[in-house]
């Protein structure tokens, strides 16, 4: 028998190499590398996984197809120096065909053949497959390292793997009639990977040597959502009962029937996936924020909210969509029930925050995209001649309006344009360094940015500021004059301030370097040229009374 092991958190404790738990093997990694042992040699689990960053990032595919998710459950069985290929393959076949009743003639198995010629072909696994009752020997297919060789890292434990695929029928060929590869590991959706059996038998050294491990292990992984779609006979993971409750809520909110929903399914898939992901993230303590895991939580919530506007949902709705997620998964994952209040509250608050700035942020983005499309020239700042928006400009939109890169990219791609991701990440890293090692995107990130964006929008409506906001020129003149347009104290807009108050001021123009810009000795002063009843100063310089010092 196997020991049932609970899922670990989406936050992988003790593993600084991972942002999120992205596979079932993460909690057993120390066993494979030999730094830990377990009181069992056989295990089975259903692991919560997130794939939204790094090598394993499915975000771009979510919504565009029926099989990818940011959050999913990975089913797996494990052998730590116990059974090996013969039992693992036989039990896989038995479960799929005898227990679940999948048609034997529709199943294929892939095995490893080294395209580099350095590792022996896995004839052992191939021959075991051919011995399974009712298995078609012609359905054993060989592939190279990309498809059928697994490595935990650049060096260390590794080995061949054997994937099980199912032929869903000619009608599932989503590229039917076009010139494409229709087959296992091909380009269409007719053939679906169900299960992967990884056989960890080698240790890879930095000089390229492969040596047999003293103990051989088995690591299997099967996407829960995929196998449910096959067993329920539907053509989309999102049409299984796993998402029924969520889609029922969306249908009620929009007044759209299932048939109408399926005609333009992308927004519904994105919302269903992202709300489920956000609920599980918050349940594991990852709340919306500006850096790392918290940025991911914020991004997927805002992306879901933005897709909500595409189907007519302009008031906060995500908490309502999350209710069935908590209800349906809560019995197996009690952390969802325990964190119910936090989940619903964070979803609603994040939606409200984003609603304050999305209009301004998307308007500024659209202005840049219009220029990009109309000119396709590098003569304009922030655009190039390849239809790609400069990543630093995209970062400015996030820093000012809280518009995540992923949403900017969505909007650009809807117009056959794109955004430079490398440039965005570089700008983000530069800003983190400038603001002292990544302090939540600096003073002008996140909620602070959104608050000031709201003031900016109001001043623009009143014609007190132009389209581009505060005029910024720290180079031309050491002296800049302007009237006080707005005052901020303790994070609130105020009409007046008294002597001794620490306040911030919004000016029509400034000669100060932006926060975290310039050098240590780049300082200056704000002075009142004439007496006025409520002296204050602020953004660009914080201080007390009528005179204060501003710095970079």
Language-model regions, residue ranges each:
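Glycine-biased, low-complexity coil/linker segments
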Residues: 538-545, 549
